A protein has these predicted regions:
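Helix-turn-helix
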Residues: 5, 9-47, 51
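Conserved amphipathic alpha-helical interaction elements at protein-protein interfaces in regulatory
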Residues: 12, 16, 44, 66, ...
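Short coil/turn segments at alpha/beta junctions that flank glycine-rich nucleotide-binding fingerprints
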Residues: 16-20, 71, 136
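A ubiquitous short alpha-helical element
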Residues: 47-49, 81-88, 113-120, 142
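Hydrophobic alpha-helical connector segments
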Residues: 51, 62-95, 147-151, 175, ...
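Short, basic, alpha-helical segments at the C-terminal edge of helix-turn-helix-like DNA-binding modules
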Residues: 54-59
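Amphipathic alpha-helical segments used for helix-helix packing
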Residues: 76-77, 90-113
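Hydrophobic/aromatic-rich alpha-helical bundle segments in the mid-to-C-terminal region
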Residues: 112-116, 120, 134-205, 210-211
Length: 211
């Protein structure tokens, strides 16, 4: 039994059952192995959650990087970040595990450190895209790190509402709100009303560039 298989099973179990209701046996059953085999890799449920989130986060991060290779403009990359976050194409991309992590991080310093490291990696990637756009003349001058932090927080907050199926926040509304904030902050025109780009393209090639 390979560790990535166990991590994929852990992501599914935690997504479906939540942290408190998930047992090591649940992960083992989904992975088609034994509880001792799971415990060989994960010494505790906290460690299981941490590594499952890191696995899911790495998948999302790698998907962004692969998509960026096909997107020539920084504005297209920001658009992709926002829309892929709103439409949640796979379980690994949604906020369910993050919500579980936030709850644990409130009272467990070790979990908090782990969360902060993963969150920082995503924010640095967003800041890198913003600086790329500034260098290319696509975006106006601003604090790239501050803008990345704010956009990340906006995505997180609205992402929680999307995860809870808030009736006032369909995915296209989330995209529109985020892109309009980006346009104001970065003094650019992303065409914020074209909110179906990522969803339509993802039915074919999710890495396709916006026309």
């Amino acid at each position: 039994m390979r560790k990535p298989q166990l991590l994929a099973a852990a992501v599914e179990a935690l997504h479906d059952r939540g942290f408190s209701a998930t047992r090591i046996a649940d992960v083992a059953q989904r992975a088609g192995t034994s509880s001792p085999a799971v415990l060989y890799y994960f010494g505790s449920k906290d460690e299981l959650l941490e590594q499952a989130l890191e696995y899911a986060d790495a998948q999302a991060y790698d998907a962004w990087k692969r998509a960026f290779e096909t997107l020539p403009r920084a504005s297209d990359k920001l658009w992709f970040i926002v829309e892929s976050s709103a439409y949640q194409p796979t379980r690994a991309d949604d906020w369910t595990l993050w919500i579980e992590m936030w709850a644990r991080a409130l009272r467990r310093p070790k979990v908090r450190v782990h969360y902060e490291r993963l969150d920082r990696r995503m924010r640095l990637l967003i800041a890198e895209v913003i600086r790329e756009g500034q260098a290319a003349g696509e975006f106006g001058e601003c604090d790239a790190d501050g803008a990345a932090l704010t956009l990340s927080a906006l995505l997180d907050g609205l992402g929680v509402q999307r995860t809870l199926d808030h009736e006032d926040l369909p995915p296209e509304r989330m995209v529109d709100l985020c892109l309009r904030w980006v346009e104001r902050e970065l003094e650019c025109d992303l065409g914020a009303s074209e909110v179906n780009y990522w969803r339509e393209r993802s039915e074919g090639d999710p890495s396709s560039a916006r026309a």
